Curated annotation (Swiss-Prot):
Pathway: Steroid biosynthesis. This is Cytochrome P450 11B2, mitochondrial. A cytochrome P450 monooxygenase that catalyzes the biosynthesis of aldosterone, the main mineralocorticoid in the human body responsible for salt and water homeostasis, thus involved in blood pressure regulation, arterial hypertension, and the development of heart failure. Its main location: mitochondrion. Induction: By low sodium intake. It is an enzyme of class 1 (oxidoreductase). GO terms for biological process: aldosterone biosynthetic process; cellular response to peptide hormone stimulus; cholesterol metabolic process; cortisol metabolic process; glucocorticoid biosynthetic process. Gene3D superfamilies: Cytochrome P450. Its cofactor is heme. It catalyses: a steroid + 2 reduced [adrenodoxin] + O2 + 2 H(+) = an 11beta-hydroxysteroid + 2 oxidized [adrenodoxin] + H2O; 21-hydroxyprogesterone + 2 reduced [adrenodoxin] + O2 + 2 H(+) = corticosterone + 2 oxidized [adrenodoxin] + H2O; corticosterone + 2 reduced [adrenodoxin] + O2 + 2 H(+) = 18-hydroxycorticosterone + 2 oxidized [adrenodoxin] + H2O; 18-hydroxycorticosterone + 2 reduced [adrenodoxin] + O2 + 2 H(+) = aldosterone + 2 oxidized [adrenodoxin] + 2 H2O. 21-hydroxyprogesterone binds at F381.
Amino acid sequence: MALRAKADVWLARPWQCLPRTRALGTTAALAPNTLRPFEAIPQYSRNRWLKMLQILREEGQEGLHLEMHEAFRELGPIFRYSMGRTQVVSVMLPEDAEKLHQVESMHPRRMHLEPWVAHREHRGLSRGVFLLNGPEWRFNRLRLNPHVLSPKAVQKFVPMVDMVARDFLESLKKKVFQNARGSLTMDVQQSLFNYSIEASNFVLFGERLGLLGHDLSPASLTFIHALHSVFKTTPQLMFLPRSLTRWTSTRVWKEHFEAWDVISEYVNRCIRKVHQELRLGSPHTYSGIVAELMSQGALPLDAIRANSIELTAGSVDTTTFPLVMALFELARNPDVQQAVRQESLAAEASVAANPQRAMSDLPLLRAVLKETLRLYPVGGFLERILSSDLVLQNYHVPAGTLVLLYLYSMGRNPAVFPRPEHYLPQRWLERNGSFQHLTFGFGVRQCLGKRLAQVEMLLLLHHVLKSFRVETQEREDVRMVYRFVLAPSSSPLLTFRPVS
């Protein structure tokens, strides 16, 4: 099923039809042999005052990905602009991602996420790896990797995720069979949100929250609301100076801080419980990432708490939205869905015996996730502050420049992905390029929760699709909006019908 971006008609036009447009992906071959200076990079002029007004009116920058996509079409695969005193260079080709990776230092630097940092500073809390730079970042990251990202760690926590995914399936079956029509039509987004929290919390703290049932406790509802609030308020605060928003966005700052306070206190309670149970006797079986970190003394307690806060907040929306869009695209592409179902049914015995086999025995389903994230990259863009000079598209880019790599535009570039408007998971079964699937970043600073997110999505889809056909009447594309992560502006209605 072809995607047609109704919100912006220009997305459907040929790439060379606009004035000043260059053939993306071929510009490097057409560039002169002599190195060109930074000042020669095409400059993009943003209407700063209009953007500021939109943000102050709490519209945020919901169309940021589309604005940048249009800029690439007009200016080519590289352009620059100023963000306050910061020089920003935007790129969107795999070759530039590879160059960024090649010059990475031992301490790859990111921008400070001002609203999140402000909360930690005001509350006297440590920062985790998402907010750290420099040697402190490396110290934390090297001690977290073996417990969160390594194959050995994945082998330990996969059975926990599988248990939650199976419980989600049983909950869905119960809802379907209670319906007189023998099927269920629903907005599945909140259910998937609850699944992501349940699975992540179980893996982190070894504790189930009971979010897959009908009656949630007031404490659970407060916690869920806080997670939503953090991502809602972040883009309203991150694009303006704190000195301005402290006066113009007082209510938003208050909501942002209160949401983080709820999450922080929740994590503190979980850590206190894990600590007490470890003091009373070490568990005989694996009981989650935090218990492993504490029992092995891998990090100071403050660092464990700081990284647990970030993992708790960051492991929910980033899993939920790709799951929503994967189910939606499979519903719009029943032939692809049937092929995935056949694969899951064929692998059912091996995955049931060892859930980790899902990572190797379901190649088409893994391709579905890659194709979904090509079209709907949850992060939108990757960022690096250059530690040394670099040449991008034959332009000199000096050290200290902020470089943004836009995944949304890369995924829709026909020079990188032929027929980008088509949902074709099978393209990933034949591709070899390692810098084309970058949703989880690259290099030593790739997403810490990458493996956990992949396992959560893979097992959930495996269990649901082998038991249910997913259908929809909606044929129009879902409009995506930038809310710190790329999210659907509205969740499509999906019908779950038991496989006969």
